[in-house]
Structures are given as structure tokens and as C-alpha cells.
Amino acid sequence: MAKPFDVSKFRKGLTKSIDGVSFGFSDPTDWISTGNYALNYLISGDFNKGIPLGKVTVFAGESGAGKSYICSGNIIKAAQEQGIFVILIDSENALDEAWLKALQVDTSPEKLLKLNMAMIDHVAKTVSDFMIEYKTLAEE
């Protein structure tokens, strides 16, 4: 018979190997509306909430389904209205400044950083580097 999985040992190993790892749940307290009550409800269970801050959110779907409009127009605009600096990673290099401005997105460098990259390794490195830098600044 196989030994049961030792969760305590696994947890200790993670704690030693990954700096800053935490365990348990952290329920979001801040949300950004998608601009669509039905979509907000599908994502959060609340017509007014939408996507949670502090969590990774991915929009995927068929071409022409409206992902770019929802993310670029509604979510970025709502985030900026809450005073949030937005980092937009455009994996298809498909979003142009005129279109974003037409959706009332502030494209100034003080409000938005748009990055064009298609390789998942580049995205992962960029996000990791940003998180390290952000954590360092927050600790100062």
C-alpha cells in the first residue's frame, strides 16, 4: 500500500524553496467592473463587481467575441477611473492608440504601459520582474 501524501512535509518544502509563499485563501476586497452587468455576475456572482484586483484574470475566446473591447475599453477605463496604473500586455500587437482613445482610455505613459510580446516566457519574465520591483518599492 502506498504511503499517504504528507501535506505538512510538502508545505515545509515549499516554504523553504519559495520566498514569500503563503497558504490559505485571500478573498478579494476590490473589484473592477467589466462594463457589462451579466458578465460581472458570471465572473463574481455580483452585478457590480466584475474582476477581482490582486488576482490573475484571463479572457479567452473565439476571434471577434469581444475580448479586446471588454478588456481594453471597459476594464482599463474602469481601472484608470479608480486611479490604477495599468500594464497592458498585447500578445497580438493588435491594439492601436487611436482605438483605445476612442474607448476613452488614457494612453499617456503616466496611466498606461502597453507591452507587445507574444512568447509566454517573455510574459512570465516581465510579470515576475515587475512583481519583484513592485515588492521592493513597497518595502522601502
Where are these regions (language model features)?
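Conserved P-loop NTPase "ATPase switch" module shared by AAA+ and STAND
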Residues: E139-E140
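A contiguous pocket-lining binding segment that forms or flanks enzyme active sites
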Residues: L115
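The Walker A/P-loop phosphate-binding site
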Residues: A2-E110, I120-T136
